[in-house]
Amino acid sequence: MLLGYGKVRTFVKLQIKMIMKKSIKRLPKRTQEELTVLLDLVRKSIGNCQMVILFGSYARGNYVLWDSNIEFGVHTSYQSDYDILVVVTGQIKYVERKLHRITNQYHDLFAGRRHAFPQFVVEHINTVNRNLEVSQYFFTDIVKEGVMLYNSGKHELAKPRKLS
């Protein structure tokens, strides 16, 4: 208990559970459509896909749909990309080649309109879990802020160890 301003205040230590979000409904409809197409392409092409997780600015909600500027007479533009972790069993190199083809298919499908670019990170489930068990920042951040777009249900993500 702490005393302050004449009142007794009790502070309770809360344990924050890392529960990954599972819905993209808060994102714009157009973004939902693009992510759904990407997810369908990934699931159809990669048989050993165990999980697909959106992370980064779109998962956090601080994405930029489109921004353009003219500075010193030069036109520049920016938009956030889709950061997507694809968790697999089996060979990663094989999956990376397929994701390159998927990216090209996706760009062909949305060629007539401005669309976000996907950036894929591919990791084996064992690598992801080993890194979570030692609380590696990149992976714990993905679990904390990410959105689970697909889960085969065959594997679970490890619980990050508490850092002291």
Residue positions per predicted region:
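Catalytic core of pol beta-like nucleotidyltransferases
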Residues: 2-53, 58-78, 88-164
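Short, aliphatic-rich beta-strand segments
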Residues: 83-87
